UniProtKB/Swiss-Prot annotation:
It comes from Dictyostelium citrinum (Slime mold). It catalyses: a ubiquinone + NADH + 5 H(+)(in) = a ubiquinol + NAD(+) + 4 H(+)(out). It is a multi-pass membrane protein. The gene is nad5. This is NADH-ubiquinone oxidoreductase chain 5. Its EC number is 7.1.1.2.
Length: 668
């Protein structure tokens, strides 16, 4: 069951990708969707065994590689964290597959699309079931390359090409950090296996590594590189620029990327390595600050966006910030709780937005929408449920998961927790503001489309509606039904999946907070609803235009529109200098300049010139040509032998020095 659960998406991807043209589009797509549905059902069964029966399954399949002391085995680890993740991944992915059957119906390359979707899911499953860092990194890289292929699915679009490259390049910074973190893990622990590392971690909390002459705590240094990987993959502040550009892919890709797969990989990495990272207060503080600032940043940017998908994308970035700073405050169970509920209502929002875009002939600008509440009533109801869940409306999913993060953050009574809680409350207001702004501009007021567009507006088809209804039901009930399972005081399901200090019982503290603090999210919700209603409902004049006549409001507006100038600074300080260095210096001045002159082109030109001058001054015979050819061949042979001997001597020298180095301890 466990192996089948992992390989079913791979089987669906191979059949659809390699044999789709022979089997036909319809049959191959049905196979891919069927494999994903079976995977989701098997994940639910595994969740029953692991979560409700309170068991852990860990087994080794084979030895992957063995080089010296490095022994990497291919194994699968199904614990509470893994079972929650595979349920979320496969359920959301199966809904996206079903939705895409009609959404991509007219696309000529739909078999390739479904193959990519299934392979994307397989790599994410491989990542979360890994029992060692190397296997996790393999899944990590697979998710990255598949995101490139999916964002760039419509490869004839220039903007899609640029967005996919941007996503890959920025994620390479994160991959670089994780790669070096894994190298340091092996250097310190002599193993990459989670069970070994987490068992030894408490005994090396004082171990240091000499870095450029400074003694640095080993766990802090390892954690720093892991955090770089988390920041890149989960689009946290600094490496977030790829996230809104990823909207260039098809809308189902956005739902899969930003709900259950790629962006949650960073949060999963923090949760998986929590038995290691929790021993470094520095790393926990960094996670808290980065997560809180990302929440604030994404909220302010989302307020001024006009693209319906980009608004939802920035809300994803903001919610990921909640999860990250919850991890930094050791609220791991609250973080995975919010990750789970967020996956369902965020997938609902993206797929509802896809239904709107599909009905409006691919229009994404909210300023060109309006009046759709009567034309697309079911889509409106689903979008409303997703919006209410996102904003924390009482008794919906987001209400339980987001409020527990805010309450436990304030209950830490440290400055980091207070800082994160204050930003979280402010972001809760901003989230409500831009969510209802989206709802009002899209579904209310007078239609702002062309008449021919209005005439063609239609509700989504059955295959697109079924996932919306299922996700809407989950967005309403899953937070309430799973609250005790995730954050209940008596829940035993987490066992050793997470690490927390024994005195870190923040759930109890959050239950006795002041009433005013518990009501703050509700006040933020009320004001967040009233403000966009005041500015955008039944517009007779653009009230925002009058607002930004105020100099401070105007500067703030442009600061947010320019995305805090991150794109500008990254282009001016990083991209342009590197392009100048690579093209003007390395390419023109060196590759096509200096190296050509002292290399093949320069030598050939000099020889031709010399020989031409020699011919003009001397009589050349056939024997002279033969003599020169023989001399050239002998010269080439001599140079080759000489180079080989020099290289051989260097190798011998290194061998001798290495032998002496190994013998030195014995001599002493």
């Amino acid at each position: 069951m466990y192996i089948i659960n992992l390989i079913l998406p791979l089987i669906g991807s191979i059949i659809t990708g390699l044999f789709g043209h022979k089997l036909g589009n319809k049959l191959s797509i049905q196979i891919a969707v069927g494999c994903m549905m079976l995977t989701a059902l098997s994940s639910l069964y595994i969740g029953y065994e692991i979560l409700l029966c309170n068991s852990v399954v860990h087994f080794k399949l084979s030895t992957w590689m063995q080089v010296g002391s490095l022994n990497v085995e291919y194994g699968l680890l199904y614990d509470s964290l893994t079972s929650i993740m595979i349920i979320v991944i496969t359920c959301i992915s199966s809904m996206v597959h079903l939705y895409s059957m009609d959404y991509m119906k007219a696309d000529p390359h739909k078999t390739r699309f479904f193959s990519y979707l299934s392979l994307f899911t397989f790599f994410m499953m491989l990542l979360v079931t890994a029992d060692n860092f190397v296997q996790l990194f393999f899944g990590w890289e697979g998710v990255g390359i598949m995101s490139y292929l999916l964002i760039n699915f419509w490869y004839t679009r220039l903007q899609a090409n640029k967005s996919a490259l941007k996503a890959v390049i920025l994620n390479r910074f994160g991959d670089f950090g994780l790669f070096f973190g894994i190298l340091l893990v092996f250097l310190v622990f002599k193993s990459v296996d989670f069970s070994v590392i987490f068992t030894v971690a408490p005994f090396i909390t004082e171990y240091t590594i000499n870095l450029l002459g400074y003694e640095v705590n080993a766990i802090t240094l390892i954690g720093s590189f892991i955090v770089i990987g988390v920041v890149g993959k989960s689009a946290q502040l600094g490496l977030h620029m790829w996230l809104p550009d990823a909207m260039e892919g098809p809308t189902p890709v956005s739902a899969l990327l930003h709900a259950a797969t790629m962006v949650t990989a960073g949060v999963f990495l923090v949760l998986r390595t929590s038995p290691l990272l929790s021993y470094s207060i520095t790393i926990l503080n960094i996670l808290t600050i980065i997560g809180a600032l990302t929440t604030l940043f994404a909220t302010t940017i989302g307020i001024v966006q006009n693209d319906i998908k980009r608004v939802i994308a920035y809300s994803t970035c903001s919610q990921l910030g909640y999860m990250i700073f919850a991890c930094g405050l050791l609220n791991y169970n609250a973080s995975i709780y919010h990750l789970t509920t967020h996956a369902f209502f965020k997938a609902l929002l993206f797929l509802s937005a896809g239904s709107v875009i599909h009905g409006l002939n691919d229009e994404q600008d909210m300023r060109k929408m309006g009046g759709l509440v009567n034309l697309m009533p079911l889509t409106y109801q689903c979008m409303l449920i997703g919006t209410l869940a996102l904003t924390g409306f009482p008794f919906l999913s987001g209400y339980y998961s987001k409020d527990i993060i805010l309450e436990t953050s304030y209950a830490t009574y440290y400055w980091e927790g207070t800082f994160a809680a204050i930003i979280g409350y402010v972001a809760a207001f901003g989230t409500t503001f831009y969510s209802f702004r989206l709802l009002i501009l899209t579904f209310f007021n007078k239609p702002r489309m062309q008449y021919k567009t209005i005439a063609g507006v239609h509700e989504a088809s059955t295959n697109m509606v079924i996932p919306l209804v299922i996700l809407a039901i989950c967005s309403i009930f899953i937070g309430y039904l799973t609250k005790d399972l995730f954050v209940g005081l008596g829940t035993p399901i987490w066992n050793n999946s997470f690490f927390a200090y024994p005195y870190n019982n923040l759930i109890l503290e959050s239950e006795v907070l002041q009433r005013e603090l518990k009501l703050l999210p509700l006040f933020a919700f009320i004001y967040g609803v009233l403000t966009p209603v005041l500015f955008y409902f039944n517009l007779k004049e653009d009230r925002m235009v009058h607002l930004i006549k105020n100099p401070i409001a105007k500067e703030s507006y442009f600061f947010f529109v320019k995305k805090w100038y991150f794109d500008f600074l990254s282009r001016v300080l990083i991209a342009v200098p590197f392009f100048h260095l690579s093209y003007d210096v390395m390419n023109k001045d060196l590759d096509k300049g200096l190296w050509e002159q002292i290399g093949v082109t320069g030598v050939a030109t000099a020889l031709v010139n010399e020989f031409t001058e020699f011919k003009l001054n001397n009589e050349i015979t056939l024997s002279t040509y033969i003599s020169y050819i023989v001399q050239a061949i002998l010269l080439i042979i001599f140079v080759g032998i000489f180079s080989f001997m020099i290289g051989f001597l260097y190798v011998e020298l290194f061998v001798i020095l290495g032998a002496l180095y190994l013998c030195l301890p014995k001599i002493k």
